[in-house]
């Protein structure tokens, strides 16, 4: 999304754009898949905000999401999130104690575990927040930066306001999905007809003639501390700037001519497995999202998408997406689709007793790069990355490129802002191109290039982007 957002913005500003994509299709994981039985699967985000839809120009092609809520499954019971947990006495008392302690002492939070206990109290932190964090990150909370907590909560008052607005308007008001722009009752979730890929298709409009698929970027070239171009399919394209959306640990490997970014190769992303279960019936989970922090479950999150978007499955049927944290090559990663489906069904019996009789099959996605992991060991370097790459004319944008937990609206907004800043700093602009990184099929590279050049021109005014 970041690559297309950047290319689209530059194209609208009169800069010619060519898109080089390493894979055989654009949009990466921001795609929808439809099977012959009438089920739709979205890998990545399931919905966007109406504000983003209007901004991109697909507002009239979206359906309003009327309901969204989360629950936590704990001790065989379901608790609404966040307010249901507040009615558990031990969690309420522990939470008050933590707040009082915070007012009377100034203990520094050095780890994610410290942050959760200070924010929620020991009971909720130890039973819910910390186990969930460790499940999706694959790291101990004591080894994670307290920055994990950044942006998790809008605050009780703000959350209550947005939840009340959602009930009154009968729309899924955005709560915790936007950081760059304010969340308010008028900002709610919508689903593009045809799937989330509709957003990417709209951003790609007008770029058809310049999109080049199966064109991986092999190297980003740096000379005298400046990004000066890229090598694509063995050919060099000179550049005045490079805007990368590649995972930062990939960026650190493909930069040639400086060792300033070698430390980025230590940054970790959490691999994930998403198992989409097809089931008979609907309303099988307590609500749209059910978090499962207890160690008895091999998964940490369940999402029954049809409770928000009933059109994603045939009438009388549903899809439940099961999120499993893993590592490449581990037991889960090596399981085939049938085995993963069976494992999920077996472990869902505690929540859906008759799930076996409802099971119709599954579809599975495995991705080696799902979420950035904020380890303390490279926290200083991560914070430095927030200020820039340290290489002149080399920018890193997007969820993976910024190594940040941001959602689609923020990805789009931040990509455009970076492009705006870039154009403001260029005295002369003649062209742009976009292309893809070598390590994964989902990464893009974008840049400015001569309007009349073909694959490997010598134009100096070029910005490059990798997603």
Regions found by a protein language model. Name each.
Residues 3:
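N-terminal Rossmann-fold NAD(P) dinucleotide-binding loop
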Residues 11-33:
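Glycine-rich FAD pyrophosphate-binding loop
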Residues 13, 215-321, 325-334, 338, ...:
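Mid-domain catalytic core of redox enzymes
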Residues 36-106, 150, 154:
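Dinucleotide-binding Rossmann-like beta1-alpha1 core, especially the glycine-rich loop
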Residues 52-66, 71-81, 120, 124-126, ...:
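Feature captures the FAD/FMN-dependent oxidoreductase FAD-binding
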Residues 100-219, 245:
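Active-site/ligand-binding neighborhood in enzyme catalytic cores
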Residues 310-315, 367-396:
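FAD-binding beta-loop-beta segment adjacent to the flavin cofactor pocket
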